[in-house]
Amino acid sequence: FGSMARFVPALPLIGGGQTRFQPIFAGDVAECVLKAVDAPTKYAGRTFELGGPSTYSFKELMEFILTTIRRKRLLVPVPFFAAYPLGMVGEILGALPFVQPFLTRDQVTLLKSDNVVGETDEDLGATADFGIDLETVEAITPTYLARYRKGGQFSEDPELIS
């Protein structure tokens, strides 16, 4: 959506932006995998749902992206029934060479369900079982969203200069 925000005056909030997410940093997932490989008897035969330390609504994530890339865009609530035709148009355009679909029907379907860690039990584990300190969206995301700001990653930002 950071890329899309560079070119369009408004961004869609599919389903009103209420879908919940629990994003996790890929480096944290890798750390969990390494711990599982290093201690197979502790983790073998179990399934783990991995999620980050916080949950966000789709709307909250969109607002965070826009704030991070310093762009003001209108966020337009789009009900699911209206998003499906948009997804079909996106798929048709995506069939053209060198065109990335802006939205697909599969993405709309995925946005109908929250993407968060559920309840755990002895067979179903969670990120906490690995005992690692998780990175936050606020700590990681600005470093790779910087390229979508006006001036790109080379515009001055005291928060990103270390």
PLM feature spans:
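Substrate-binding strand-loop-helix patch
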Residues: 20-27, 48-68, 77-88, 133-135
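Hydrophobic "lid"/C-terminal helical patch
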Residues: 30-37, 65, 137, 144
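A short C-terminal helix-loop "cap" of Rossmann-like NAD(P)-dependent dehydrogenase/epimerase domains
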Residues: 2-15
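Core catalytic loop region at the nicotinamide-binding pocket of NAD(P)H-dependent oxidoreductases
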Residues: 36-51, 71-76, 99-103, 122, ...
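A hydrophobic C-terminal alpha-helical subdomain
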Residues: 81-162
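Substrate-positioning beta->alpha
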Residues: 15-38, 45-49
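Residues at helix-coil transition
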Residues: 6, 38, 70, 142-146
